[in-house]
Amino acid sequence: MTSLLLHAASAALLLAAVSCHDNPPTAPSSGQTPPATYRLVWSDDFDRDGVPDATRWSYDVGGHGWGNNELQFYTAARRENARVEGGHLVIEARREPWEGLSYTSARLITKGKGDWTYGRIEVRAQLPAGRGSWPAIWTLGSTTPLRWPDDGEIDIMEHVGFDHGVVHASVHTRRYNHVDATQRTARTSVPDAAAGFHVYATEWTADRIATSVDGRVYFTFDREPQGGRAAWPFDAPQHLLLNVAVGGDWGGQQGVDDATLPYRFLVDYVRVYQRTP
């Protein structure tokens, strides 16, 4: 998610000390067939109602705009904003007063509980569509403190509610980032993104990042032979983030339609694969 996330590491709230790696994931029960050369290393099928699994997820917390002038306050372990019900993770942005702001939402992270170098990250999700909504599936470097954009960012899926049915994929690095208007990005049409579930995925190797919807690749970013770390910082661990922002520099370009709230971002599963040695 395109943002200056200098506060993200200090805002992370770790709610459990048990590592997700203590519970090896089981084989997928639905969705796309995993690549034959990959093995499943991390997953959440959201099959237990309640707050999200604290062995897999933590939260970024706060309401300082997150570098994008966003309007929401991100809460932690609050079921109104993040819960598992009916086999789905629900991230819900709501209009309500909270810590001096008018909206609440949640931003879930796997940092310290799921950090990977290379692999395939796959999320099956249904998006909100109200004007002012800004859901995202993305990764950030797992260093502490975070150095953005030096540590890299992979945007697997972003959708802004005023541009219904269009999803975006991007990468951000020191050389290529939205602050300098040099980011590498692409967009594709998913007309029923808010009416049905789709598989948003990125395949990340030592030389290429390729992002797809339902198996159709629409964005690639290749390592430059002489680019150095400024162009390719993606040889170090990254972690996953799922969130719904309200408004902001991009999501709020055409305002926020309060009549369309709450915004609900539904996630059927998250799966991470890595190549079999």
PLM regions: where:
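C-terminal motif of bacterial Sec signal peptides marking the signal peptidase cleavage site
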Residues: 16-19
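Extracytoplasmic entry segments of secretory-pathway proteins
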Residues: 9, 22-24
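Bacterial N-terminal signal peptides that target proteins for export
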Residues: 1-9
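GH16 jelly-roll
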Residues: 24-277
